[in-house]
C-alpha cells in the first residue's frame, strides 16, 4: 500500500489545547482520527490526556479522600463574626477539624488559605529565611501571604508541643519542632502584625492532656471576648469533631483493604506525615499509584493495630508522627494478605 493511500485512509484533524488538570497548564496537541480515536503529544502526565489503549480501573486514592474529609469543616460563606485565617500547612493538617469547629462554635468565621500551588508558594518564598528548611515549612509562607491578601482579621497557628498520645506503650508524643514553633518564624520573617496590621495568634497548647488543653484555650479565647461556658462547650464539640474525623479515616482504610482482599487487588499503605496529603507536597504520588489500579490507604488504618512494635523497634518512640509509621510498618509486615505493601513518604 502506498503512503499516499495510507494518509488518505487515515485522515485526521489537529487541535491545540490547554490542559487544566493542574496549575502547569501544559500545551497539548491533539490528533483526531475519523474512527473516533485520538493521539496526544505535549502532555507531561496522563491525568487528563493519555494514549492508553485500555483504560484500567483506577484504584482507591485515600490521600485524596483524606484531604477532602479534612477540609470539609470550612465555614459557610454567609457566616458572621471575626475572620480567623488558618494557613493550610504543617500541623493544621493534623488538627483542622478541631480548630475549625472550635472557632465556629465560638462565633468566629474561619477562613482557610487557598489550596497549594506554585503561584501561592512563590508569593511567600521571598520571606523564607533558611534555604535548608523543609519544603512544607517554606510553603507555609505562601499560605500566610494568601490570608493577608484576603484581609482576615487575625491569623491562627498554635504552638502544639504535644499531639495526642495514641498508645500507652509509646514513650511520648512530641511534635516536630518545626511544626510546633513555626509561628515564631512567620512572626519574624513576615511580621503580619507590624507590616499588615493582622495579629498572628500562637497560643501554646497540648493535645496530650485535655485539662491543660482546656486551660490554655480558655485563656486564649477569653482574650477574644468569648464567655467561659461557651469556650468549654466549644472545646467539647471540637474534640468530638476531631475524633469523628480520625475514626472515619480508620474505618475507611480497613474497608478499602477488606474490599481489596475480596477481589484480590493490590493495596499500598502510603505512610506519611499529615501534611503529605497536600498534592503539591507529595507530587501526586498517591494519584499515580491509584492510576495503575492499586488501592492506596493511609497509616490511619493501623491506628489500633501494631502497638506491640514499641517493644521491638530500635528507636526512641517519642515523636507523634513517626510513631504511627512504626506501627503501620509493623502491621503491614505481620498482615496475612500477600498483596498488602507499604511505601513511606519522607
Predicted features by range, described:
Residues 1-346:
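An N-terminal assembly and electron-transfer interface module characteristic of large anaerobic redox
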